[in-house]
Amino acid sequence: MATAQLSHCITIHKASKETVFPSQITNEHESLKMVKKLFATSISCITYLRGLFPESSYGERHLDDLSLKILREDKKCPGSLHIIRWIQGCFDALEKRYLRMAVLTLYTDPMGSEKVTEMYQFKFKYTKEGATMDFDSHSSSTSFESGTNNEDIKKASVLLIRKLYILMQDLEPLPNNVVLTMKLHYYNAVTPHDYQPLGFKEGVNSHFLLFDKEPINVQVGFVSTGFHSMKVKVMTEATKVIDLENNLFRENSTTEIAHQGLDCDEEEECNDHIQRMNFVCSQQSSECSRKKRKVSEPVKVFIPNRK
């Protein structure tokens, strides 16, 4: 299903009046708007190319020669409404400078198994000027440093989306039934204890990911506006990826592909580990004690009979 939809999603559109991102970024407000749109566009690309929701749940926007599908409110599809509320919750936490990381996770066992199929991680960091956003669908990236001009920011954004599209095309199709959730992690020092964005509740701060088979970690991209930056990563089982390395390296940029666990935050200063028993991916280390972070999570969304 995802492959079939791809041909509709990536189309050449030479004369476009509607654009995805602002043409100029000169202050923090414009930068925040850019990061929000890049985040929402990334989530939309993932859900569309993985075939999670019907065509009616998407509108169309344009980015250079790409015709993108962007999630919109579709009352006939409750699942898409849930995702939009999650995105809006992330926006609120971003505006308040609370959000450290948003993790979108896909499971394929509706009976309650916690075995992960795919994970997309978005990290956010805040500088004196503003925030930085890392999108980790577990890889790395084309990097443009803070303070670069608008053209460089646009190039980095377009390349990130293109590489995300390539990655989605190279993943095996999902089964008919999928369970979706998103966890939000915060900066404890600035986030009120009782803070919860709309659509979220207090969550469990777990650093373990359980895969059936060995996972692969792919850093897709990094974009910096001078006020905010975004990094993109993806994690899935290595056996589910089709010719990923060859296709990503066609994009004249650096792409890191590694068999490893989640990236540790700089604050945590600990190493990644994969425990071979059941391929449990963990960010925890016996040599690294970490403070318990505040986490929010929504009700999981079950998406049945996608075909």
From Swiss-Prot:
GO terms for cellular component: centrosome; chromosome; cytosol; nucleoplasm; nucleus; synaptonemal complex. Residues 29-234 form the HORMA domain. It is found in: Nucleus; Chromosome. It comes from the Eukaryota. Phosphorylated in a SPO11-dependent manner. GO terms for biological process: meiotic cell cycle; meiotic sister chromatid cohesion. Keywords: Chromosome, Meiosis, Nucleus, Phosphoprotein. Highly expressed in testis (at protein level). Expressed in lung adenocarcinoma and squamous cell carcinoma (at protein level). Expressed at lower levels in the liver, brain and kidney. Interacts with HORMAD1. Essential for synapsis surveillance during meiotic prophase via the recruitment of ATR activity. Plays a key role in the male mid-pachytene checkpoint and the female meiotic prophase checkpoint: required for efficient build-up of ATR activity on unsynapsed chromosome regions, a process believed to form the basis of meiotic silencing of unsynapsed chromatin (MSUC) and meiotic prophase quality control in both sexes. Required for the DNA double-strand break-independent, BRCA1-dependent activation of ATR on the sex chromosomes that is essential for normal sex body formation. This is HORMA domain-containing protein 2.
